Structures are given as structure tokens and as C-alpha cells.
């Protein structure tokens, strides 16, 4: 609560603090203002500096970061869970003691009424109510209340005013009159920000003192070549230990000796006070049975002032460290994301490069395979063509040789390459080996297949023959008119005997050869042999 008031009212005075940055002399001479000297790094950053930085950032461009709603909701959920956890723990620890106290007071009242028959229960309740009212008014009902001790003497009133402006509010004493309550309201409104200024100044001075001390420690460790992180950790530990010794341990020992508390109760009071919680169950100088010195309560308030400044410096330092840590964490996360994106890009590029290389290699292999296959097809076509030419008569071979010397070679080779599947013939060596043990019927069938192949080839050749070759072909055609008559006779013979497959094949072969310009000279030589074969078959 107190630190919220401090931040709010410090923001009101933060604007005038930024005014000395301007230098009138340099401004009038037309020169840019000299840069302000960079302050030495300090361990603690006061609330005033933080507020000034926020004001300057807002005035320069409105770049002040705003917490997102998701973050606010997440923090709210964490706080609620923290509160529920604390409530469960406190209930488990304190509720049994409260129940035992209720049973104890009920038994005490019953025993008192039984021992004192003249006192009615109503009179006892009235007495207890008066005791509670006196305690709430700051008067202890224990002992003789007619002594000279008072909760509103100068020392006690000064201590109460200190608890108001420090927002501790122990609650052991409070104003009971209407005038006192009204004055307390106004006094708190103007006193809390005033004390905030004082607290900020003391925090700056404490931060400067401890910063110089820590700088000396850092110099000592730098000579020993210790890393910067270790130096800061050691400096922080030393700062916290020194503050705990000065503002927690020593006051706890003093309170234990003066107030008669245990060590736990003394430390409990110190921490509750310096954190401005102030439950009021333990208050320094609140025991009516102890005769305190006049300077005791003002000294306690001065300790509260310096201790609050120390705790404010520590909390501010922790907040700054959390901001720096959050910023570094964001930067590290950004770097991790950048590295991840770079790694992903590299992996993608390598994958693409590998895929490209594989595709190129596969394409090259396919090209090589296609080239080898094409070469094999060409070689097979040439072998088959040579085999077909070997089966022709010498006159036809001479004609094809004359055609090969011209432009027919490329056209015939292209025709063979375009139709490799139609040239499924065996090589000459295999044909010779197979022909040695084959029957006459197989020989006739082979000649028939050769004639069909020759017919197909000559159909393609006709389409690609140039004009000069066509003239040679026509001349050769006129020269073989006598042979055409023999073809007609052979066709008549084929028509008369349709049941003979071999003769039909021979007729088709002769017809195809004559039709394509091939004149088999050995036809007459084979006629007697074919006739004898047909007679034997019939």
C-alpha cells in the first residue's frame, strides 16, 4: 500500500526533475547541448528514476509497454491461487488454537460463575464488554489503570503519527473521537506523499553508499579475473547480507532484550513492520508494564524510516533485475527463434539441393539408359536389315546398295528407329543354328515372316524415297515386267490351293517382294521343291 502511494506521488514531481537537462548557454550559441554525464552504475534504482524514465519514454513517442490482458489474467490467477494456498495453510495452523481458546474461555466463565454465585452471567458479560472497549481505546484493562502511563503522551502520539504516514497502522491504538478521526484522514492524505519523498531520498543515498562499496568489491574480484556474472551475484549477496544484519538482526536482538520477546517474535515484528504489514499483535513500546525511556519510541520510528528505505531499495532492485531478466529472456527467445528459422531454412535449402541433385542424377541415368536402348535398337535394326538383305537375291542387294549410297540411308535408319518393336527378328548366327535342325515347314514359315517384314519396311521406304531414287525404282520396275507375269501365275496357283499354308505364305512373300520392287531370281529354282513338298503333304 505504501509503495503504491510512493510511486503515484513521485510521478507528480518527476517532470521538474528532468528540466536541468537543457543548457541555456549552448542553446543560445547554436550548438547542440552537451551530453549529460553518464551516471555510474548503481545497484539500486530508486522509484523516482524509474518514474522519470517512464515519463520521458511516454513523452518521446508513447512507446511505453503495456501489459497484455493475457498476462494480467495469468498473474491474477497466480495471485488468487497464492491467496487460496495461504488461506488453507493459515486455517490449518490457527483454527485449532482458536477452538481451544473458545473452549478455555467458556470453561473459565463457567468456573467463575460457579465460584462466585453472587455474580450473574449478565453482569459478567457487561464487565467483559467494558474490558474490550478499553482495549480498543488503547487502555489496557490489566492491572491498575490509575497509573500515569498513557497511549497519547507525546512519545506515543509521535509513534502513532509515524505509523500513519508510513502506512503500517499497527492498530493497537486508534483515534476514538470524531475530531481525531477527521484529522487522521487529512493527516494521512498529506503525510504519506511527504514521507514518500523522504523515503526516496534516503533510498538513493543508501543505494549510493552500497553501490560504492560494491564497486570496490567488484574491483577486487576483477583483479582476480572473475566473471562479471559471479561478481554481480556476490555483490548482491553481500548487499542483502549487510542490510539484513543492520536492519533485521541487530534490531531483533534489541527488541528481544527490551520487550522480553522470544527470538521468533522479535524477527516476526521486524519483518511485519518493515514490510508495512503491521498486524499490531506485537508493538514496540506497547507493554504497559514496562517503563520505557522517552527517546525509545522516536528511535524505533527512525529505525522504521531507514528500514523502509532499505526494503524499498531492495524491492526496486529486484524489480529492475526482473525487467532486465525478462528483456534478456525475450532476446534469448528471439535469438533461439532466429536460429531455428535459419536452421529450418538451411535444412530446406539442403533438402531442395539434394532433391535437385537426385533428380539430375536420375535424369542422367534415364538419359543414359535411353541412349543405350536407342543404340541397341539401332544396332538391332541394322543387324535385322543386314539379315533381311542377306535373304534377298544379288540383284535386289545391288539395288539396296545403290540406294544406301544416297539419302536413303538416313531415312531408312530413321524408319527403323521409329518402329523398333516391329523388328523382333533373330540374328544371323541364331538363324543359321536354328535353321540347321528345323523342318521344311518352319523354313517356309520363316520366309513368310520375312516377307511380311520386308513388306512393312518397303511401305515405309516408299514414303521416304527421293525423286531420283523413285526414277531408279520406276526403271527397275519396267525392267521386271516379265517377272510380274510369273507373279500372276503364282497367284493363280495360290488361289487354286487355299488349304496349303506354306504355299499361301510363299505367295504372300512373292507378292510383297514384287510389289516393293524386289525380284527374287531364285523363285523358279524353289518352285519344284515347293510343289514336291505340297504333294507330300497332301
From Swiss-Prot:
Q: Where is the composition biased (Basic and acidic residues)?
A: 522-538
Q: What is the lineage of its organism?
A: Eukaryota, Metazoa, Chordata, Craniata, Vertebrata
Q: Which residues cross the membrane?
A: 72-92, 182-202, 234-254, 299-319
Q: How does it sit in the membrane?
A: Multi-pass membrane protein
Keyword annotations of the record: Cell membrane, Disulfide bond, Glycoprotein, Ion channel, Ion transport, Membrane, Potassium, Potassium channel, Potassium transport, Transmembrane, Transmembrane helix, Transport, Voltage-gated channel
Organism domain of life: Eukaryota
UniProt protein name: Potassium channel subfamily K member 10
DNA-binding: present as a keyword of the record?
Answer: no
UniProt-annotated binding residues for K(+) 2: 168-169, 277-278
User: In this UniProt entry, which residues are annotated as the site pH sensor?
Assistant: 151
InterPro entries for this protein = 2pore_dom_K_chnl, 2pore_dom_K_chnl_TREK, K_chnl_dom
| UniProt main location, coarse | membrane
Where do the annotations place K(+) 3 binding? 169-170, 278-279
Amino acid at each position: 500500500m505504501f509503495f503504491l502511494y510512493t510511486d503515484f506521488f513521485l510521478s507528480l514531481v518527476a517532470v521538474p526533475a528532468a528540466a536541468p537537462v537543457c543548457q541555456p548557454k549552448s542553446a543560445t550559441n547554436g550548438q547542440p547541448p552537451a551530453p549529460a554525464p553518464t551516471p555510474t552504475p548503481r545497484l539500486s534504482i530508486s522509484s523516482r528514476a524509474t518514474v522519470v524514465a517512464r515519463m520521458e519514454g511516454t513523452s518521446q513517442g508513447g512507446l511505453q509497454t503495456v501489459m497484455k490482458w493475457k498476462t494480467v489474467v495469468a498473474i491474477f490467477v497466480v495471485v488468487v491461487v497464492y491467496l487460496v494456498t495461504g488461506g488453507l495453510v493459515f486455517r490449518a495452523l490457527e483454527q485449532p488454537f482458536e477452538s481451544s481458546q473458545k473452549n478455555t474461555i467458556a470453561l473459565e466463565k463457567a468456573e467463575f460463575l460457579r465460584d462466585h454465585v453472587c455474580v450473574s452471567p449478565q453482569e459478567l458479560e457487561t464487565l467483559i464488554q467494558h474490558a474490550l472497549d478499553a482495549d480498543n481505546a488503547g487502555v489496557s484493562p490489566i492491572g491498575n489503570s490509575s497509573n500515569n502511563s498513557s497511549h497519547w503522551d507525546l512519545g506515543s502520539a509521535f509513534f502513532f503519527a509515524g505509523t500513519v504516514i508510513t502506512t503500517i497502522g499497527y492498530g493497537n491504538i486508534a483515534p476514538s473521537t470524531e475530531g481525531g478521526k477527521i484529522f487522521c484522514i487529512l493527516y494521512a492524505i498529506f503525510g504519506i506523499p511527504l514521507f514518500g519523498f523522504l523515503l526516496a531520498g534516503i533510498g538513493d543515498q543508501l543505494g549510493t553508499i552500497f553501490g560504492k562499496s560494491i564497486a570496490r568489491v567488484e574491483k577486487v574480484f576483477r583483479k582476480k579475473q572473475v566473471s562479471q556474472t559471479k561478481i554481480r551475484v556476490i555483490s548482491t549477496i553481500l548487499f542483502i547480507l549487510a542490510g539484513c544484519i543492520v536492519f533485521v538482526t541487530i534490531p531483533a536482538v534489541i527488541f528481544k532484550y527490551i520487550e522480553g520477546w522470544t527470538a521468533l517474535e522479535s524477527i516476526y515484528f521486524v519483518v511485519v513492520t518493515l514490510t508495512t504489514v503491521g498486524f499490531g499483535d506485537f508493538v514496540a513500546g506497547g507493554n504497559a508494564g514496562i517503563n520505557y525511556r522517552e527517546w525509545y519510541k522516536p528511535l524505533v520510528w527512525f529505525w522504521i524510516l531507514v528500514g523502509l528505505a532499505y526494503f524499498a531499495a531492495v524491492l526496486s532492485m529486484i524489480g529492475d533485475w526482473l525487467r532486465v531478466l525478462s528483456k534478456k529472456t525475450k532476446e534469448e527467445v528471439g535469438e533461439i527463434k532466429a536460429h531455428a528459422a535459419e536452421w529450418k531454412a538451411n535444412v530446406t535449402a539442403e533438402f531442395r539441393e539434394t532433391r535437385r541433385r537426385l533428380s539430375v542424377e536420375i535424369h542422367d541415368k534415364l538419359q543414359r539408359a535411353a541412349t543405350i536402348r536407342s543404340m541397341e535398337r539401332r544396332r538391332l535394326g541394322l543387324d535385322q536389315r543386314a539379315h533381311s538383305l542377306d535373304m534377298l537375291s544379288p540383284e535386289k542387294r545391288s539395288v539396296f546398295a545403290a540406294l544406301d549410297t544416297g539419302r536413303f540411308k538416313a531415312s531408312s535408319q530413321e524408319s527403323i528407329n521409329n518402329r523398333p518393336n516391329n523388328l523382333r527378328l533373330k540374328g544371323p548366327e541364331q538363324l543359321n543354328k536354328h535353321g540347321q535342325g528345323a523342318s521344311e515347314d518352319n523354313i517356309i514359315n520363316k520366309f513368310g515372316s520375312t516377307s511380311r517384314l520386308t513388306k512393312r519396311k518397303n511401305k515405309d521406304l516408299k514414303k521416304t524415297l527421293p525423286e531420283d531414287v523413285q526414277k531408279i525404282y520406276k526403271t527397275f520396275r519396267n525392267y521386271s515386267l516379265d517377272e510380274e507375269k510369273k507373279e500372276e501365275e503364282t497367284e493363280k496357283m495360290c488361289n487354286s490351293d487355299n488349304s496349303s499354308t506354306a504355299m499361301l505364305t510363299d505367295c504372300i512373300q512373292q507378292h510383297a517382294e514384287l510389289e516393293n520392287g524386289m525380284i527374287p531370281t531364285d523363285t523358279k529354282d524353289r518352285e519344284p521343291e515347293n510343289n514336291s513338298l505340297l504333294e507330300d503333304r497332301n
